[in-house]
């Protein structure tokens, strides 16, 4: 909560979103909301206990669900559930979609990135997920209302749903030309593309006494060299291909 409050106090910061597994939200949600948190993304890949243990290697599904329930008490904080379809039988994607059916919560299905541990899963195509959902809930209609965020997610409405269904399909529906994402790792490295090591070391600049203006120039230089797009489908490993896992990168 203290970090959220500090970030919100910075001039120019318009919105702060927290992505989490939700296990501590039952205790911390009130403080996070009071600190000014605008939006919350909670990772939930299955409602099956054994499946959750298999995916996360931690038996904390009940804590995540309690966190989601607690977050729903704060309507001023936009709530989204992120699900990464892995193509394993323990996942019932329709059960996850029920959150958007029963509550004013947006459920987003995020295509597996073939990075680190993710390269061992086949995942599921957006088309297959749409087919599964439409068989149970009816037609998904492209959402054309006010933006629900500033990212690449494509949202759909379903008759009778309180929330929206979204898809972030970076591989099968490549959106690199519209990408507005950069990531700062826990080691202080600014990454401009998930597939490549391209970026700048901000930690080193800070430790060497870099000024705000110098940091701005470093960031501008990194952005000017942002790759035009990923080449995951080509399955060709270049010298600058990222070897870190998503948990190490931050995302």
Where are these regions (language model features)?
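Radical SAM/AdoMet-radical enzyme domain recognition
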Residues: 1-110
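Auxiliary Fe-S-binding modules of radical SAM enzymes
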Residues: 101-102, 112-115, 119-251
